[in-house]
């Protein structure tokens, strides 16, 4: 069994890793690299919104005051967990789907044949690149619908977290348009 010192050190190490991962993502996001970009940022913000909804749900479940709504909140927790995972996955998926489009922009267009080829490739790549943002939009919308129940029936101590979660999901939705 770990003693208090070992637990604190373990927590501190996890916190440092998390800060490093966030810093790395933000550094890459702010670089001149085309990915990650707005799509990946939208996916991440949506996942953060879901996480806030999950926090509200977890603060609600198991409390006497909310016993009557516990089953409904548990269902929301299950759905938000799935939506959060999909939004996290969308961060990398968006970058992968955008790479061919970024490469297509570099294709030559000196001759008519090159112009036609570039146009064809660009159209195909644009379609593929738009799929993940559309998915982010859908996942964010599905998540937002669950927040009305959290707002009405979730722990009143976490009502501000419901509001921040809603704003995150709205940003994810509009950012993916």
Task: Enumerate the language-model features and the residues they cover.
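Amphipathic, well-ordered alpha-helical segments in soluble domains
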Residues: 21, 25, 48-55, 97, ...
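Conserved phosphate/anionic-ligand binding catalytic regions in large, soluble enzymes, centered on
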Residues: 31-54, 158-176
């Amino acid at each position: 069994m770990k003693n208090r010192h070992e637990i604190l050190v373990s927590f501190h190490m996890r916190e440092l890793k998390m800060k490093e991962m966030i810093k790395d993502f933000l550094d890459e996001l702010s670089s001149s690299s085309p990915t990650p970009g707005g799509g990946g940022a939208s996916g991440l913000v949506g996942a953060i919104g879901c996480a806030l909804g999950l926090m509200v749900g977890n603060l609600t479940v198991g409390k006497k005051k909310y016993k009557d709504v516990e089953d409904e909140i548990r269902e929301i927790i299950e759905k938000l967990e799935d939506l959060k995972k999909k939004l996290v996955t969308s961060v990398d998926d968006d970058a992968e789907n955008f790479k061919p489009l970024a490469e297509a922009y570099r294709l030559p267009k000196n001759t008519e044949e090159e112009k036609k080829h570039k146009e064809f490739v660009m159209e195909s790549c644009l379609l593929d690149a738009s799929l993940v943002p559309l998915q982010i939009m859908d996942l964010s919308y599905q998540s937002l619908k669950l927040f009305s129940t959290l707002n009405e029936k979730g722990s009143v101590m976490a009502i501000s977290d419901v509001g921040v979660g809603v704003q995150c999901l709205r940003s994810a939705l509009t950012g993916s348009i």
